C-alpha cells in the first residue's frame, strides 16, 4: 500500500514479467487439455473398431461425430497456443522498448491475439484478467464488451458432413466399415427367446458405455 491507502503501481518490467508467467502457465493448461482429449480419442477409436466388427454402423457414426468435434476442439486449442506465443513475443518486444523509451507501448499484435484468446473457454478467465491489466497499462485498447461475451462456439457442429464421417470411419477401420450394416439389427440373426434377454442386456451396457464416453469428451471440450 502506498500513501493515503492507495495501491502502489508495479513497475512496467515487473508487470510484463508477470503477464509472461501467466501466459506460460495457461499454455501448460492447454497442453494438458490437448493430451486429455487425444487420449480419450484413442479410446473412441478402439470403440469404433469394436462396433464395426459387430456391424453396428449407427454406433460408429455417433462415435465418428464425437471424434470430429474433438479434433476441431484440439485444432482450436493449438490455435490458441499460437496466439499465446504471439503475446509472449509481444511481451519481449515490450521489454526491449521499455529499455529504450522507458515506458510500455501500444501493440496491435498483442491486441489481436488477446481478442482471440478471451474467446477460448479453457483460458477465458485468465485472458480476460490479463486484457484488463494490459488495457490499464496502455498496451492494448479497450475491448468491446461483446468481444468478451461472444464466448459460445458459433461453429459448433450440429450435424457432421457425411463425407467427413465416412473419411474418419475409413481411416479407423482401414476401409472395412463399408461391410457393416446401416443398423445393428441388420446383422443380427433371429434370436432364440433365451438369448434375446442377453442380447438386450449387452446392447444396454454398450449404450451406457457410449453415453459415458460422449460425456467424458464433452467435459474435456468444455
Curated annotation (Swiss-Prot):
Interaction with STAMBP as annotated region, ranges: 196-222, 203-207, 221-222
Pfam family, one: Snf7
Cellular location(s): Cytoplasm, Cytosol; Membrane; Endosome; Late endosome membrane
Keywords associated with the record: Cell cycle, Cell division, Coiled coil, Cytoplasm, Endosome, Isopeptide bond, Lipoprotein, Membrane, Myristate, Phosphoprotein, Protein transport, Transport, Ubl conjugation
Example GO biological process: regulation of mitotic spindle assembly
Cross-link (Glycyl lysine isopeptide (Lys-Gly) (interchain with G-Cter in ubiquitin)): 179
Annotated region described as Intramolecular interaction with C-terminus, given as residue ranges: 2-113
Residues carrying the site annotation Interaction with STAMBP: 216
Residue positions of motif MIT-interacting motif: 201-211
Topology relative to the membrane: Lipid-anchor
Bias (Acidic residues): 200-210
Leader sequence residues: none
Domain of life of the organism encoding this protein: Eukaryota
Region described as Intramolecular interaction with N-terminus: spans on this chain: 151-220
Important for autoinhibitory function, as annotated region: 59-64, 168-169
Family according to the record: Belongs to the SNF7 family.
Identification of the protein by name: Charged multivesicular body protein 3
Gene assigned in the entry: CHMP3
Amino acid at each position: 500500500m502506498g500513501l493515503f491507502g492507495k495501491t502502489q503501481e508495479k513497475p512496467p518490467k515487473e508487470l510484463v514479467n508477470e503477464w509472461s508467467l501467466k501466459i506460460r502457465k495457461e499454455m501448460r493448461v492447454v497442453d494438458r487439455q490437448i493430451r486429455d482429449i487425444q487420449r480419450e480419442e484413442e479410446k473412441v477409436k478402439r470403440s469404433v473398431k469394436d462396433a464395426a466388427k459387430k456391424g453396428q454402423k449407427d454406433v460408429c457414426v455417433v462415435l465418428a461425430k464425437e471424434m470430429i468435434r474433438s479434433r476441431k476442439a484440439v485444432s482450436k486449442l493449438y490455435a490458441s497456443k499460437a496466439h499465446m506465443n504471439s503475446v509472449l513475443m509481444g511481451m519481449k518486444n515490450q521489454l526491449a522498448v521499455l529499455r529504450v523509451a522507458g515506458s510500455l507501448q501500444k501493440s496491435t499484435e498483442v491486441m489481436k491475439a488477446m481478442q482471440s484468446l478471451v474467446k477460448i473457454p479453457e483460458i477465458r478467465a485468465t485472458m480476460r484478467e490479463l486484457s484488463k491489466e494490459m488495457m490499464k497499462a496502455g498496451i492494448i485498447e479497450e475491448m468491446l464488451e461483446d468481444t468478451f461475451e461472444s464466448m459460445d462456439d458459433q461453429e459448433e457442429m450440429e450435424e457432421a458432413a457425411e463425407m467427413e464421417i465416412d473419411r474418419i470411419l475409413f481411416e479407423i477401420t482401414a476401409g472395412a466399415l463399408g461391410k457393416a450394416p446401416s443398423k445393428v439389427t441388420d446383422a443380427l440373426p433371429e434370436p432364440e427367446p433365451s438369448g434375446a434377454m442377453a442380447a438386450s442386456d449387452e446392447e444396454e451396457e454398450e449404450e451406457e458405455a457410449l453415453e459415458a464416453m460422449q460425456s467424458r469428451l464433452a467435459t474435456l471440450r468444455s
